UniProtKB/Swiss-Prot annotation:
It is found in: Secreted; Secreted, Cell wall. SMART domains: HYDRO (SM00075). Residues 1-23 form the signal peptide. Its main location: secreted. Self-assembles to form functional amyloid fibrils called rodlets. Self-assembly into fibrillar rodlets occurs spontaneously at hydrophobic:hydrophilic interfaces and the rodlets further associate laterally to form amphipathic monolayers. It comes from Pleurotus ostreatus. GO terms for molecular function: structural constituent of cell wall. CDD domains: hydrophobin_I. This is Fruiting body-specific class I hydrophobin fbh1. The gene is fbh1. Disruption phenotype: Leads to retarded growth and displays denser aerial mycelia. Slows down primordia formation, leading to fewer primordia and subsequently fewer fruiting bodies. Aerial growth, conidiation, and dispersal of filamentous fungi in the environment rely upon a capability of their secreting small amphipathic proteins called hydrophobins (HPBs) with low sequence identity. Class I can self-assemble into an outermost layer of rodlet bundles on aerial cell surfaces, conferring cellular hydrophobicity that supports fungal growth, development and dispersal; whereas Class II form highly ordered films at water-air interfaces through intermolecular interactions but contribute nothing to the rodlet structure. One of its GO terms (cellular component) is fungal-type cell wall. Keywords: Cell wall, Disulfide bond, Secreted, Signal. Pfam families: Hydrophobin.
Amino acid sequence: MFSIRIATVVLAASAALRPPARITNTETPVNQCGSGSIQCCESVQSASAAQAAGILGPLDILTNLQGLVGSHCSPLAAVGVSGTSCSSQTVCCKDVSKSGLVNLGCSPINLNL
């Protein structure tokens, strides 16, 4: 009976002395955007969509693009700062063209994590 109590105490002590497990976050922070910039776009659609072709054609931008195209975008420079928000689609875009009128190579991101 006494040996069971000692074994229990030893197990409890060894568990208490064990270092905590290290957790590594492999996700890219939401306020960072790989090789592009965080934008708030009124509209985001596939580059092959008719709506995107209608925007890209008159601006002399190649229409054989792939991926997502954001239109009427504005930069979100200070993500996480009070008052910074996007009521439309938040995206990470690699190429900002025509002063944000059209952004190419966009990927949707979630700032509400």
